[in-house]
Swiss-Prot record:
<feature type="site" description="Stabilizes the basic form of H active site to accept a proton">
    <location>
        <position position="95"/>
    </location>
</feature>
<feature type="binding site">
    <location>
        <position position="70"/>
    </location>
    <ligand>
        <name>tRNA</name>
    </ligand>
</feature>
<dbReference type="GO" id="GO:0004045">
    <property type="term" value="F:peptidyl-tRNA hydrolase activity"/>
</dbReference>
<dbReference type="InterPro" id="IPR018171">
    <property type="entry name" value="Pept_tRNA_hydro_CS"/>
</dbReference>
<keyword id="KW-0694">RNA-binding</keyword>
<dbReference type="InterPro" id="IPR001328">
    <property type="entry name" value="Pept_tRNA_hydro"/>
</dbReference>
<comment type="similarity">
    <text>Belongs to the PTH family.</text>
</comment>
<feature type="binding site">
    <location>
        <position position="116"/>
    </location>
    <ligand>
        <name>tRNA</name>
    </ligand>
</feature>
<comment type="function">
    <text>Hydrolyzes ribosome-free peptidyl-tRNAs (with 1 or more amino acids incorporated), which drop off the ribosome during protein synthesis, or as a result of ribosome stalling.</text>
</comment>
<dbReference type="GO" id="GO:0005737">
    <property type="term" value="C:cytoplasm"/>
</dbReference>
<dbReference type="Pfam" id="PF01195">
    <property type="entry name" value="Pept_tRNA_hydro"/>
</dbReference>
<dbReference type="GO" id="GO:0006515">
    <property type="term" value="P:protein quality control for misfolded or incompletely synthesized proteins"/>
</dbReference>
<keyword id="KW-0378">Hydrolase</keyword>
<feature type="active site" description="Proton acceptor">
    <location>
        <position position="22"/>
    </location>
</feature>
<feature type="site" description="Discriminates between blocked and unblocked aminoacyl-tRNA">
    <location>
        <position position="12"/>
    </location>
</feature>
<feature type="binding site">
    <location>
        <position position="17"/>
    </location>
    <ligand>
        <name>tRNA</name>
    </ligand>
</feature>
<dbReference type="InterPro" id="IPR036416">
    <property type="entry name" value="Pept_tRNA_hydro_sf"/>
</dbReference>
Length: 193
């Protein structure tokens, strides 16, 4: 398998969304950028903030779309097209209602599960074959509460569990980047429960 060349963190721009559950993808790529001494810069042609880092000797692009969640695919397509990055070389990091806080899972392809960011990316890439890193945020219990729930800050114990899942995920990203996704999946799925 080829490795990951683009890691996209999903979220919404602006200070009012910064600490909300829906911005879990931003949290992970911010930490990744910091750990690997990258520098974010706003890039209009890619509709977002971008950074380039090196992991395991390979260049990896980081992207935070500034289009708001529902139009994330616009930014992903622009960068992927410009650098000739294939869908299976893209890892999209996003909040996941169907996993408890503290649980993180890699997955390739599949549906969008009602996540509008994933839906837009799959539509614009004309493929759902990109990789996902699903960061559990839990579910409010009532489907009608979802929109409100994802745009609120997690409780303190949930935030701690999310932070631990982010760190566990970051430990496995070098394997994912170097094309050892099966190993990364096994390690993460065993560790981040």
């Amino acid at each position: 398998m080829s490795g990951i060349r683009l890691i996209v963190g999903l979220g919404n721009p602006g200070p009012e969304y910064e600490k909300t559950r829906h911005n879990a993808g931003f949290w992970l790529v911010d930490e990744l950028c910091w750990q690997f001494k990258g520098n974010w810069r706003s890039e209009g042609k890619f509709h977002g903030d971008v950074a380039r880092i090196q992991i395991e000797g390979q260049d990896v692009w980081l992207l935070k779309p500034m289009t708001y969640m529902n139009l994330s695919g616009q930014a992903v397509l622009a960068l992927a097209h410009f650098y000739k990055i294939l869908p299976d070389e893209i890892l999209v990091v996003h909040d996941e209602l169907d996993l408890a806080p503290g649980v993180a899972r890699f997955k390739q392809g599949g549906g969008h599960g009602g996540h509008n960011g994933l839906k837009d990316i799959a539509a614009r890439l004309s493929s759902p074959a990109f990789w996902r890193l699903r960061l559990g945020i839990g579910h409010p219990g009532d489907k009608k509460e979802v929109a409100n729930f994802v745009l609120k800050k997690p409780r303190a114990e949930e935030q701690q569990a999310l932070d631990e899942a982010v760190l566990a995920s970051l430990r496995e990203l070098p394997r994912a980047v170097s094309g050892k996704m099966a190993e990364a999946m096994k390690a993460l799925h065993t560790e981040a429960k």
